[in-house]
Amino acid sequence: MGKVVGIDLGTTNSVIAVMEGGKPTVIPNAEGFRTTASVVAYTKSGDKLVGQIARQAVINPENTFYSVKRFIGRKQNEISQEIRQTSYNVKTSGSSIKIECPALNKDFAPEEISAQVLRKLVEDASTYLGETVTQAVITVPAYFNDSQRQATKDAGKIAGLDVLRIINEPTAASLSYGLDKQNNETILVFDLGGGTFDVSILEVGDGVFEVLSTSGDTHLGGDDFDQQIVEWLIKDFKQSEGIDLGKDRQALQRLTEASEKAKIELSNLTQTEINLPFITATQDGPKHLEKTVTRAKFEELCSRLIDKCSIPVNNALKDAKLEASSIDEVVLVGGSTRIPAIQQMVKRLIGKDPNQSVNPDEVVAIGAAVQAGVLAGEVKDILLLDVTPLSLGVETLGGVMTKIIPRNTTIPTKKSEVFSTAVDNQPNVEIQVLQGERELTKDNKSLGTFRLDGIMPAPRGVPQIEVTFDIDANGILSVKAKEKATGKEQSITISGASTLPKDDVERMVKEAEENFDVDQKRRKNIDIRNQAESLCYQSEKQVKEFEDKIDEELKNRITNLISELRSNLEKEELDSIEANSEKLQNALMEIGKNATSAEKDTQNASNDDTVIDTDFSEAK
């Protein structure tokens, strides 16, 4: 078995880790960073960019895709809040969500965009490890429903990965935190990421990680905190200038990026400045936006969101049947937990300072790597007992949801209930599988519907139909219905809960495989161009630095090569870019030789002037 990696596929950033020498290690990406921006962009010429280099939403808002995790596994009626926060177009295609890419004149499923991020992580990890990575453990928010979990697996499959396990993010964080803990502790994991929020309570110690309860909100995250600043800035600018910046995509994206930056700075500073010159223009000329944001103002703007974060904490404590005083440690996960008001709120609720021993950006991926190590046989004596976050059941007479597996049931699990017919001589039953906590069918999420035919004619209430729910270790559900008298059976694996039909997933996998060489070539071409641009800059810098130490012929040759290379870059002449880059690198090496030679000549001349004739006697 090759290396199995652990991946935290985040809303804002993603991280990949692996077990090395018995210890979980974060793998840096090709650019040398330990986190990779969960952003994919397509340039006007159709080139694909992934990661930090793709953060170009200000100049290319409609083709830059970020926070896509907020759409994965969802339907149109579930994303009204999230759509307002993007600069790209999101639309419905049948029951699925599609993301428009004008640069390619193509629509993408959210799973395809997430697959691009996964592929970038895995390719960089393969280079780092010196072997091809094909297997992974991927984390999801604990409060992800069945559709979102299946969609995450689909994204992994499209990226060419065998996803061995889907694991909850707070549970992964607990694995990282409690790996070396011998004594039993009750910990609360508070996970506030870019787009989702989870709280899990676990018993940790001596290799056993048991989830007692989990709660959360998949519509709450750092993006929403940014949005509060954005809306405040738009309102203020409209009042002072009479212009609605919310209708200008480019301005809106600049506001979003500036708001995120301000939020981050306010974790360490009590106030910061937002300066956006030329944010818009009128017939009177350009308009600039300048605004001071204090931490107090930020907390006032976000007070509703901060209060909202307390609800899942209280729910998790209630479900675990624990008082706040029973919690030994609070582990903070996700970049948004750096917000001082969040830390203060947690301290107020639990009565103790949060544990600061783990890196909130990396702890989930490290835990996923531990679970990957368990599955690969590298890590022994670890027992992970996770739970299902939401209740599962079926629709019964009157549009009522009858729960079969209550929320916070330890998984994997299997439970059965016997139902009957509602009318005399009913030949079949339609079984609607539901997920949620409400009493009525219409208020819960429908995961899928299937029909059991061939029921023997009988008065209502006589036939016995056994419905069995089976949840695997990934938290993914399959349901079976069996008529006891005839033995007739029908089943459904709730992969239909994914917004992508199986045929679409297979097509996307095939497309990804077919385009692998093209993608690699495009990426190589982008790298060549980036290196050439950097080389031009470095060359100009060195010519200026060593101007008095190199001869005129070399200086002119380098200047001409820089001009040629810049011309090649403008015309996208890749062969010439490579050839002239090599010539320019060789010329730069000559600068080094010339400079060293000139320095030696200077030193020799200096030494000749200061030589003193003398004899040294041998030491006795």
UniProtKB/Swiss-Prot annotation:
**Intracellular or extracellular location(s):** Plastid, Chloroplast
Q: Bias category Acidic residues: which stretches?
A: 610-620
The cysteines covalently paired via disulfide bonds are none
One GO location term (cellular component): chloroplast
Q: Does the keyword Plastid apply?
A: yes
Q: Is the keyword DNA-binding assigned to this protein?
A: no
Task: Give the region (Disordered) as residue ranges.
Answer: 592-620
Entry superkingdom: Eukaryota
Which Pfam families does UniProt cross-reference here?
HSP70
SUPFAM superfamilies named in the record: Actin-like ATPase domain, Heat shock protein 70kD (HSP70), peptide-binding domain
Which keywords describe this protein according to UniProt?
Answer: ATP-binding, Chaperone, Chloroplast, Nucleotide-binding, Plastid, Stress response
The record's PROSITE patterns line, in alphabetical order, gives:
HSP70_1, HSP70_2, HSP70_3
Any GO MF annotation of the entry: ATP-dependent protein folding chaperone
Family annotation (InterPro entries): ATPase_NBD, Chaperone_DnaK, Heat_shock_70_CS, HSP70_C_sf, HSP70_peptide-bd_sf, Hsp_70_fam
Q: Which HAMAP family match?
A: DnaK
Q: Which family does it belong to?
A: Belongs to the heat shock protein 70 family.
Q: What does this protein do?
A: Acts as a chaperone.
Q: Under what name is this protein listed?
A: Chaperone protein dnaK
